[in-house]
């Protein structure tokens, strides 16, 4: 099967549902015979970007590195699923420009919903001051103004979110319907 490479970049607050959507989309794509790789922000931080902190500069470096790897894979015909908070709009635009074949997916859920879903207790630690610079609490998240797809995970089921991304990939001829 001939396939075009594309990076599908899922951005949103911690707990919004990026990883859940990524895994469901990964399964659907693999079951359909597509070659793909998943770059999860948490996994990347323990390997490729180990040693980086959470300053704006380090976060930008982290996203640039994920973008570089995504670009290499995309230009070689691989579908890349990136699941990363990527809180700053400017760096998301930079990697979009670098990669070219790029879909921005805004995984959108209200902060209160993300806090309710927080099994690691990170939001509570951020609110108590135990964690500093936590996105959405004391560090900004700049939502995309014009994403290719928006998934409202507080209002729609997982299958609907995956279906919206799938349909966009079909519409843009990255995959067959």
Swiss-Prot record:
SUPFAM superfamilies: P-loop containing nucleoside triphosphate hydrolases
Annotated catalysed reactions: adenosine 5'-phosphosulfate + ATP = 3'-phosphoadenylyl sulfate + ADP + H(+)
Binding site for ATP: 12-19
Key word NADP present: no
One GO term (biological process): hydrogen sulfide biosynthetic process
Membrane-spanning intervals of the chain: none
InterPro entries (alphabetical): APS_kinase, P-loop_NTPase, Sulf_AdTrans/APS_kinase
Catalytic residues in the record: 86
Similarity field: Belongs to the APS kinase family.
NCBIfam families: apsK, PRK00889.1, PRK03846.1
Protein name, entry field: Probable adenylyl-sulfate kinase
Protein species of origin: Synechocystis sp. (strain ATCC 27184 / PCC 6803 / Kazusa)
Gene: cysC
């Amino acid at each position: 099967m001939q396939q075009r490479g594309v990076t599908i970049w899922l951005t949103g607050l911690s707990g919004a549902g990026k990883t859940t959507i990524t895994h469901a989309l990964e399964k659907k794509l693999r079951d359909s015979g597509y070659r793909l790789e998943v770059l999860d922000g948490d996994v990347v931080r323990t390997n490729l970007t180990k040693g980086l902190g959470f300053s704006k500069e380090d976060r930008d470096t982290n996203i640039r590195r994920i973008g570089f790897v995504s670009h290499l894979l995309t230009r070689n015909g691989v579908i890349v699923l990136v699941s990363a908070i990527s809180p700053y709009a400017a760096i998301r635009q930079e990697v979009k420009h670098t990669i070219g074949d790029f879909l921005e997916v805004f995984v959108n859920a209200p902060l209160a919903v993300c806090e309710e879903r927080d099994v690691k207790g990170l939001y509570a630690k951020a609110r108590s001051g135990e964690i500093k610079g936590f996105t959405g609490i004391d560090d900004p998240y700049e939502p995309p103004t014009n994403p290719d797809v928006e998934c409202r995970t507080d209002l729609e089921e997982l299958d609907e979110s995956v279906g919206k991304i799938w349909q966009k990939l079909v519409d843009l001829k990255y995959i067959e319907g």
